[in-house]
């Protein structure tokens, strides 16, 4: 609901700022993870595509580690699907064909500063 209270033009601008910040942090995280990770951190591979898009493959997820430790694995599908909802409302493009939270070997995330995505996963994802 909180996202819905923000005016739509502001959401689009916020989405671009958020993803550009996320992009910079992902590049830094690639270097930082070489020195080891916190037990609840993410292990990623980042790739710049162009000014509008980038990809992150997540091979270790902090949410999954945390959920397993505290017996809360049932929350994972909902947590995993939040990426779609946020991108949908902020006017960003997002797609993912594999998801760790559904038992796949990685989350293959494709982000676009300007793009479209469904509010929830489609196709074979649960």
Describe the function of each predicted region.
Residues 1-69:
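Amphipathic interaction/junction segments at domain boundaries or subunit interfaces
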Residues 15-19, 76, 83, 107, ...:
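Solvent-exposed, non-transmembrane amphipathic alpha-helical segments
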Residues 22, 90, 110-114:
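Short amphipathic alpha-helical patches
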Residues 42-102:
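Short, hydrophobic/π-rich interface segment
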Residues 97-106, 110-126:
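Activation/maturation switch segments at domain boundaries
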